[in-house]
């Protein structure tokens, strides 16, 4: 569950510590991406009707942003040593990348309740955690206080970390020249991929829903 600042002072301190920036439409390419300042834009009633007609006859994705039309002020805090790529899942469940956050910085985002965000290493696409989980869903603000999304490194397995290091040192075309077990060639070539992670998270969500039935 997103961490809320206990008071405005804490919110200000958290923002200063993370080097928070607030991006307007011009800096964020808002007009091109349909973003409101640094966050995605909600659809109006007419657009919703058109979306529903287009979606008729095909299943709606399990993981997608909900068009709640309820604003939520969020601060993305990059507390990892990696350059972070925020990714918003739009209303069709398609990943939409947003401007990167350098280590130790933050950004105020104008998002909405029910929107889905995930975060990746901008260079390697390794998965990162947000508030100790893989998906971030903004809730409503309480007394105008922003929701903090703290982005951190997960505890990678030894194998995962070794694969990351080898990928950083060896070009993909040279993987199979390494004197290692053959199965590791395939592991090295299986680069992190947002779409694959979304498929896995979707299956986990479906399994969890079935267990709850």
UniProtKB/Swiss-Prot annotation:
Domain of life from the UniProt record: Eukaryota
Q: Which GO terms describe its cellular component?
A: cilium; cytosol; endoplasmic reticulum; intracellular membraneless organelle; microtubule cytoskeleton; mitochondrion; nucleoplasm; nucleus
Query: What's the effect of swapping residue 115 to Q?
Result: In VHLD; type II
| Effect ascribed to mutating residue 156 to D | In VHLD; type I
Q: Spell out the residue ranges that the record assigns to sequence repeats.
A: 14-18, 19-23, 24-28, 29-33, 34-38, 39-43, 44-48, 49-53
Q: Where is this region: Interaction with Elongin BC complex?
A: 157-166
Q: In which pathway does it act?
A: Protein modification; protein ubiquitination
Impact when changing residue 114 to R: In VHLD; type I-II
Q: Where is this region: Disordered?
A: 1-65
The consequence of residue 178 to P is: In VHLD; type I-II; common mutation
Q: Residues annotated as region Involved in binding to CCT complex? A: 100-155
Phenotype for residue 106 to D: In lung cancer
Effect caused by changing residue 159 to E: In VHLD; type II
Instruction: Please give the annotated consequence of changing residue 175 to D.
Output: In VHLD; type I
Effect ascribed to mutating residue 131 to T: In VHLD; type I
Which consequence is recorded for altering residue 180 to V? Answer: In VHLD; type I
User: What outcome follows a substitution of residue 122 to I?
Assistant: In PCC; requires 2 nucleotide substitutions
Could you say what the effect of mutating residue 98 to H is?
In PCC and VHLD; type II
Any one Pfam family match given in the protein's UniProt record, by short name: VHL
Q: Which family does it belong to?
A: Belongs to the VHL family.
**UniProt name for this protein:** von Hippel-Lindau disease tumor suppressor
The major lineage groups are:
Eukaryota, Metazoa, Chordata, Craniata, Vertebrata
């Amino acid at each position: 569950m997103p961490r809320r600042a206990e008071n405005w002072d804490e919110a200000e301190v958290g923002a200063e510590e993370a080097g928070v920036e607030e991006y307007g439409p011009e800096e964020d390419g808002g007009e091109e991406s349909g973003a409101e300042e640094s966050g995605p834009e909600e659809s109006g009633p007419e657009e919703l009707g058109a979306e529903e007609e287009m979606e008729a006859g095909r299943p709606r994705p399990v993981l997608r942003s909900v068009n709640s039309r309820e604003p939520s002020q969020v601060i993305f805090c990059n507390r990892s040593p990696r350059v972070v790529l925020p990714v918003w899942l739009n209303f069709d469940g398609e990943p939409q990348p947003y401007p990167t956050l350098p280590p130790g910085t933050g950004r105020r985002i104008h998002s909405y309740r029910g929107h889905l965000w995930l975060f990746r290493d901008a260079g390697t696409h390794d998965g990162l955690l947000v508030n100790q989980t893989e998906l971030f869903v903004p809730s409503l603000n309480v007394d105008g206080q922003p929701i903090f999304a703290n982005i951190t490194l997960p505890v990678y397995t030894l194998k995962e970390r070794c694969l990351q290091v080898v990928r950083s040192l060896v070009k993909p075309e040279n993987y199979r020249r390494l004197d290692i077990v053959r199965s590791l060639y395939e592991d090295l070539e299986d680069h992190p991929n947002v779409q694959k992670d979304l498929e896995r998270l979707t299956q986990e969500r479906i399994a969890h829903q079935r267990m709850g039935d």
